Structure formats: structure tokens, C-alpha cells
Design a protein with these regions (language model features):
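Active-site phosphate/pyrophosphate-binding segments
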Residues: 257-261, 265-286, 376-504, 512, ...
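Conserved short alpha-helical segments that host acidic/polar catalytic motifs at enzyme active sites
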Residues: 1-243, 247, 256-263, 271-281, ...
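Glycine-rich oxoanion-binding loops at beta->alpha junctions
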Residues: 67-84, 262-276, 301-336, 342, ...
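Catalytic-loop motifs flanking and including active-site residues across diverse enzymes
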Residues: 124-127, 296, 300, 396-401, ...
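Glycine-rich phosphate-binding loops that contact phosphosugars or nucleotide phosphates
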Residues: 280-426, 459, 505-549, 567
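Acidic/histidine-rich
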Residues: 155-185, 449-475, 516
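Generic C-terminus detector
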Residues: 551-592
Length: 592
């Protein structure tokens, strides 16, 4: 969600800050701003919209030869997206940027108003700035920060500048923030991608740590005392903002799927590497995730239960921590997150740890909170996704889960032979053949893009596929929704209207007839059907259809979903939607 970066050193401050904000664009935002200082004077420049608009304003308005500064991309949570609510916020001597949610902001605001503070914005962040300014009146800055954090409830990462003090301050609780270490320069950032252009050395802040940065020093304090922190080295390659000739990042990232899939599958051609995939010792698995990652989990659930005989439940992370836990023997909690910083998923992981339950993270970001804190992890190595709607990262999450289900089934001697592993080896080439047919998906999109709603229906694993296909269409073109085919007649069918497209996913021969029966029910009420199926099941002469190659059930979904990703892309393109940055969405959801 919100992105923070800061810099103090000898380079041009605004250039470093803007580069950081551009690298953080993938997180999602609706406004941006910087605060910069030359040691005596402070400038705050904000804009609503893209970082490019902020850069234009900076080029026009910046008059300082600044030495340090902080910057922010905001995704509105408290207060609408406008210039007043954009960060940074200045109250008295304090200027700050904030990622997170201050849950007791309304109460604190009333207290501060009684003390004479007036507020310009609707944000909880301005309340935090005011409280820090109030505490600074009778205390030094480190004490003031400590006292303020004792009052605040909720989550936060702060970058702070103090009038008359030529240092940067940083602290965090639950929201991510790290310190970058350079040569006569230092940085702060929400994640390493914002600063990797300048340094790969960084320090992770723990809750209660306060970082004080000058160009030459980085001091960390905890409970008022200086402490030493390990300097880590990141192997991140940063954000590749190029589109390689494609019109949108989403299309580029879809087309990269065969390559990243091949890289992952190559890792497990060596049988010695497959031991980390074996979950045969567990009798119960909870998969916890949000959004697309949760729908990847639904695919995994179907495969584990069908082929490995392990009971699997899939939960939205936002609900899991509040659920009564009924663990059986040998449980495992699998956490899936592209960013590794999804707030609800992190909270669920920590809840599992409190209960002594083993956790396994499937993550893309090796420097993330989940990657660091889970008991063990598998990295998907999809590379950074710029488009907000995930594509290649989702496919690799499904691939990891599918490989786990297969290896576990083989260890338990429930699946014999090597045919299914061979299906994985053939998968990248088959997927390329699906994606090479992208002009056909554009043609199918012609029958959808002018509609106001759209149903996806399926049974079993096909329903899991429908959920992700529907989410993609919702995210980028604002059309919906997915339903279990057998549940249509229990209420949902009342929503069917004349000429409504209903997409029916059929990859399981045993469920084919029932799914078609449900599709015909919608057609009898005026809908028109579109069938997404496999070559061996294709006898749908009278339907608009998308047909993908037939493969193992362990790999079949990874041919169907990319076809639906392309279909969603072309529907959004024809509707004139902002494909890479859909309205109201953030890539990395770092608040609960």
C-alpha cells in the first residue's frame, strides 16, 4: 500500500527520492509527496495522481539545494485522496510520512484539539505528527518518539524530520521499514526495491527500534539505549520498469510465465531438491492467504485432498486470526503471499507461532517479513510484478502447491510412476502455445467487454480456477463474479439477465455433464455461455470456447488460468481501464 523512502547524503535528494517512489509505484497509490531540507529551510511538495505529476511539480517548485528528505506514496485509508490528505504532514516542528493505520486516532485527535492543535487533513497520520510534536515540547526527540509510540495503537512505519535537527528518524510497528546503508549516505524505505539502485546493504528495524540517520552515521536505539544491528545483504535486482515492447506491464508479465515456470520446475528436476516439497508427515494443513494467493491455495487444497489424502482448509488471512483453532495431530500452516508483507497474513503467521504450530511460507520476496519469520519457506522467484493484478506470481504459487501435492502423494505411494513430473517438464512449452494464441482471446473479449456483469461457474478444482479468473476480470475491468456451479439454483440464478456472459470452466471429465447442465440453466434464462475446457473434453460445437491442451490434473490449472488472464486483459483494454493500476487497488496490502 503506502510507500516510504528517505535519503540523507551528497546526491541530489529529490532525484533519489523520486527514483525510490517510482520503484514503489507497484505497491499502489493515489497521491505522492516529498519533504526536503537544506538544513535551514523546509519544502513540502505534493500531488494527486502519479509520481510523474509530482516530478513535474518538483521541477517547477523546488528551490532548495536539499541535503536530506522523506517521500511517500499514499493509498487512501483515512481521508479521501486529495492534496491536503497527501503526505508528508507537518505539525509544529514535526514533518512525517506514515504507512499503517492509527486505530485510536479519533480519540487522540479530540485530546490534541483540547490542547490547542488544529488539523487540516482527515488523516490519522497528521494526528500522529501532532502527538509527537506535543511530546517534543517537554522531551528530547528520542524520548518524545518513545512516549508517542506508547500512546498509539495500530500499525505504523514512520519517516520523520524535526525542525532544527539535520537528521532523519525512522521507526516501525507491524508495517515494514528498513534502513539502507551507503557510502557517506543513508536511506530508509518500505522495501529494498526503493533503494537497491544505490545500495544492497540494509538493516531491518524491529518493533521499538528507533533509527537516527545522518549522512555518515546510522544509530539504532531501543528503550533509549544504543544497540547494534546486523547489516544484511540483498540480492534483489530491483524493479524493471521496462515493458519490453508490450503495451502494459500486465501483458508483459503474463508472457513471462513460461520462463519463470521453467526456472521453478528446473529446480525440482533434481530429486534431491524435492525433499522440501514433501509434506507427508502432516495430517492437517491450513492454507492462509489473501486474494489471488488464497485462490492458489484453493487449487492446492483440491490436489492435496484428492491425491495426497491430507485434510486441507483454506482461510482468508483476515479471518484466520479470529477463528477458534481446532488443530489435530501434526498440523501445518502454509502462508502464501507474493510480497511477503501482507499484514493479515503476517498476523496469522504470528498467531500460529504463539500456538506452537509450524509454518511454511510460499513467498516471492526473499527480504520480506514472512520469508524471515516463518519456520521454513519456498521462494517462487517470479521477479517483481509491476502490474497490481498478479499473474506470474500466482502461477508460481500454484506450481509450488501442485509440486508439493505430487511429491507428498508419491512419498505416500498414492501416485505411481513419473508421468506427472514429466507433465511439469512439458508445461512451459504448452503454456507458451496457449499464450501465443492471444489474438483469439481478444476476439472472445468482444463478446464480454460491453456487459455490466459476468458469471464464472465451475465445480471442484474448476471452481478454484473460476475464482481466480473472476478476480482478474474484477480487478482490471470491474466485471464480476464467480460461483460454484451447483449453487446457482440456490439463489444466484436470480441475478442472470438477458445476454449476460457465463463462463463455464470444465477440466474434469467426471464433472463435465453436471457443469454443462448448470450452464444450460443460465442459458434458459437468457445468458450466453462461453466454455473454457481442455482438448480431450472439447465437443462444444455450438459455444464460444477457449480450448487449452490436455495435461495432468496437477498442471492443468496452469494452462487455464493464463488464458483467463489474457481474456481479462483484453476485456479491460477494450473498456479503456487503467490495466496496470486499477482503481482503489494496492499491490502490497500492508494494513489490516
Amino acid at each position: 500500500m503506502c510507500g516510504i523512502t528517505g535519503y540523507i547524503g551528497k546526491k541530489k535528494t529529490t532525484e533519489v527520492l523520486l527514483n525510490g517512489l517510482y520503484a514503489l509505484e507497484y505497491r499502489g497509490y493515489d497521491s505522492a509527496g516529498v519533504a526536503i531540507s537544506d538544513g535551514k529551510n523546509l519544502e513540502i511538495i505534493k500531488s494527486v495522481g502519479r509520481v510523474k505529476e509530482l516530478e513535474t511539480k518538483i521541477n517547477k517548485e523546488d528551490k532548495l539545494n536539499s541535503l536530506y528528505g522523506i517521500a511517500h506514496t499514499r493509498w487512501a485509508t483515512n481521508g479521501e485522496a486529495n492534496l491536503v490528505n497527501a503526505h508528508p504532514h507537518k505539525v509544529g516542528k514535526i514533518t512525517l510520512v506514515h504507512n499503517g493505520i492509527i486505530e485510536n486516532a479519533d480519540t487522540l485527535k479530540e485530546e490534541l484539539e483540547q490542547k490547542g492543535y488544529k488539523f487540516n487533513s482527515d488523516t490519522d497520520s497528521e494526528v500522529a505528527a501532532a502527538m509527537l510534536d506535543y511530546k517534543l515540547k517537554d522531551n528530547d526527540i528520542l524520548t518524545a518518539i518513545k512516549l508517542t509510540t506508547e500512546i498509539l495503537t495500530g500499525s505504523y512505519a514512520f519517516g520523520i524530520m524535526v525542525e532544527g535537527d539535520n537528521s532523519l528518524y525512522a521507526l516501525r510497528k507491524d508495517s515494514p521499514l528498513l534502513i539502507g546503508i551507503g557510502d557517506c549516505e543513508n536511506f530508509l524505505a518500505s522495501d529494498i526495491t526503493a533503494i537497491i539502485k544505490y545500495t544492497n546493504k540494509y538493516i531491518l528495524l524491529d518493533v521499538g527500534d528507533i533509527a537516527v540517520l545522518t549522512s555518515d552515521t546510522c544509530k539504532i536505539y531501543h528503550d533509549g539505549k544504543p544497540i547494534e544491528k546486523e547489516i544484511l545483504i540483498s540480492d534483489s535486482k530491483g524493479v524493471d520498469n521496462s515493458k519490453n515492447g508490450y503495451k502494459h506491464h500486465m501483458l508483459k508479465e503474463i508472457m513471462e510465465e513460461p520462463v519463470v515456470l521453467n526456472n521453478l520446475i528446473e529446480r525440482y528436476k533434481n530429486k534431491a531438491n524435492r525433499s522440501e516439497l514433501d509434506l507427508s508427515k502432516y495430517e492437517q494443513i491450513d492454507i492462509v492467504a489473501c486474494g489471488s494467493a488464497m485462490y492458489a491455495g484453493l487449487v492446492g487444497q483440491n490436489l492435496f485432498e484428492e491425491y495426497a489424502n491430507i485434510k486441507v482448509d483454506v482461510y482468508p488471512a483476515s479471518e484466520y486470526r479470529y477463528k477458534k483453532k481446532l488443530y489435530g495431530k501434526n498440523p501445518l500452516v502454509i502462508l502464501i503471499s507474493q510480497s511477503g508483507e501482507t499484514a493479515d497474513t503476517i498476523a496469522a503467521m504470528r498467531e500460529a507461532h504463539k500456538l506452537g504450530i509450524e509454518t511454511l511460507g510460499i513467498v516471492n520476496n526473499p527480504d520480506s517479513t514472512i520469508a524471515r519469520e516463518c519456520d521454513r519457506k519456498i521462494l517462487t522467484n517470479a521477479g517483481v510484478e509491476i502490474a497490481v493484478a498478479t499473474t506470474k506470481a500466482y502461477i508460481l504459487q500454484v506450481c509450488v502447491l501442485s509440486l508439493m501435492a505430487l511429491e507428498t502423494a508419491k512419498v505416500k505411494k498414492l501416485v505411481q510412476g513419473d508421468e506427472d513430473y514429466k507433465a511439469f517438464e512439458k508445461l512451459p512449452a504448452l503454456l507458451k502455445s496457449v499464450l501465443d494464441n492471444n489474438s483469439y482471446y481478444e476476439k472472445v473479449a468482444d463478446s464480454i467487454y460491453q456487459k455490466e456483469s459476468c458469471f464464472f461457474i465451475g465445480r471442484g478444482i474448476d471452481y478454484a480456477i473460476c475464482m481466480e479468473g473472476s478476480l482478474k476480470l474484477k480487478e482490471v475491468s470491474y466485471l464480476h463474479e464467480a460461483y460454484q456451479a451447483g449453487e446457482l439454483k440456490h439463489g444466484t440464478i436470480s441475478l442472470v439477465e438477458e445476454n449476460m456472459p457465463v463462463l463455464c470452466v470444465i477440466t474434469n471429465k467426471a464433472l463435465k455433464d453436471k457443469s454443462i447442465s448448470n450452464l444450460k440453466e443460465t442459458e434458459a434464462r437468457g445468458a450466453f455461455g462461453i466454455v473454457i475446457t481442455t482438448k480431450d473434453l472439447d465437443d462444444f460445437e455450438n459455444y464460444t470456447k477457449i480450448v487449452v491442451p490436455t495435461t495432468s490434473m496437477f498442471t492443468q490449472s496452469m494452462l487455464v488460468v493464463p488464458a483467463l488472464q489474457l481474456l481479462s486483459y483484453y476485456v479491460a483494454l477494450k473498456r479503456g481501464c487503467d490495466i496496470d493500476k486499477p482503481r482503489n487497488l494496492a499491490k502490497s496490502v500492508t494494513v489490516e
